Structure formats: C-alpha cells, structure tokens
A protein has these predicted regions:
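Small/polar-rich, solvent-exposed N-terminal microdomains that initiate assembly or binding
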Residues: 1-54, 88-113
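Ser/Thr- (and often Asn-) enriched beta-sheet segments in non-cytosolic proteins
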Residues: 25-27, 118-123, 139
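Generic structural motif
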Residues: 31-33, 46-48, 69-71, 127, ...
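Short, solvent-exposed beta-strand/turn "edge" segments of beta-rich domains on protein surfaces
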Residues: 51-57, 128-131
Length: 146
C-alpha cells in the first residue's frame, strides 16, 4: 500500500463518519491532550494484517473512540455512528491526496474515486471511563476493493 492510498483511506473514513455525525469534534490518529470539549471522537486506523504487494491490506480496521462527559450523549453518538456503519455497505475511497483544485474561474472538479472500503463487520466495546469521560470504542473491519 502506498502512503498516498493510506492517507486517502484515512481522509475518506473521516469524511464519511464526520458527515454522519457532523456536530462533534474529530481527531485522526491522535487527540488533543488539553481537550475541553464535552465530547469528541478519535478516528484511529490500523493497517497490516494480511499484506498484498499490489493491493491494500485485507481486513484492516478503523476504531472510533467516542469520549463524552455525558453518558446519554455518548449513547446518542454511538447510536448515530453504528446506524451509519450498518447502512454503509461500502465507503467510497476518494483521491484527496492527488486532488488539484481548479484554476480561478473554472468550475469545481469532483474528487476521483480510487476504490471502496467494504465493511465486513463491527464490534462495540463496553463502556469505560478515562479521566472524566465515558468512553466506548467501535471497531470497524473492512477490505479495500479497487
């Protein structure tokens, strides 16, 4: 897998999930250590289970770590995201890295689709507590299809 494809997968996952829950604060593969938000979501990606030289890894996963100071808000966010996963089927992977914006005066150009992430399953963790946040993780397993 190329670095560009990996970044496109990250960006596509974030665009998909943040579009399904747009009122939250999102972090990709990191979080703000000085967070003050009442709730936020970390999107963490993992690659490397069954490598193929020509394609992306099979059965990779992403983890959505949902943090909230309110358990009812946590449950609402989890419900919204799991509904988005169950209804997704496949998530399009767009070329965000290689995108060139149009010149001034030219009409906008859509991002090119380079493949899709076929969701095979997801797992929902039990609720835990970190600092003063209630936390649950959604682990989504997928395969990249060209």
């Amino acid at each position: 897998m190329t670095a560009a494809l990996y970044r496109n997968i990250q960006a596509s996952l974030r665009m998909y999930f943040s579009g399904k829950y747009s009122s939250g604060t999102w972090y990709i593969d990191r979080k703000n250590e000085n967070m003050t938000e009442d709730s936020f979501i970390e999107l963490q990606t993992s690659m490397g289970r069954a490598q193929d030289d020509r394609k992306a890894y099979q059965y990779d996963f992403t983890q959505l770590l949902v943090h909230s100071k309110s358990v009812s808000t946590l449950d609402t966010i989890i419900g919204t995201l799991t509904a988005a996963i169950e209804g997704a089927g496949a998530i399009p992977v767009m070329d965000y890295v290689g995108y060139t914006p149009p010149s001034e005066g030219e009409p906008p150009v859509a991002h090119t689709q380079v493949g899709e992430l076929q969701i095979s399953r997801y797992e929902l963790s039990q609720q835990s507590t970190i600092s003063n946040y209630a936390v649950r993780a959604i682990t989504v397993y997928y395969e990249f299809i060209e």
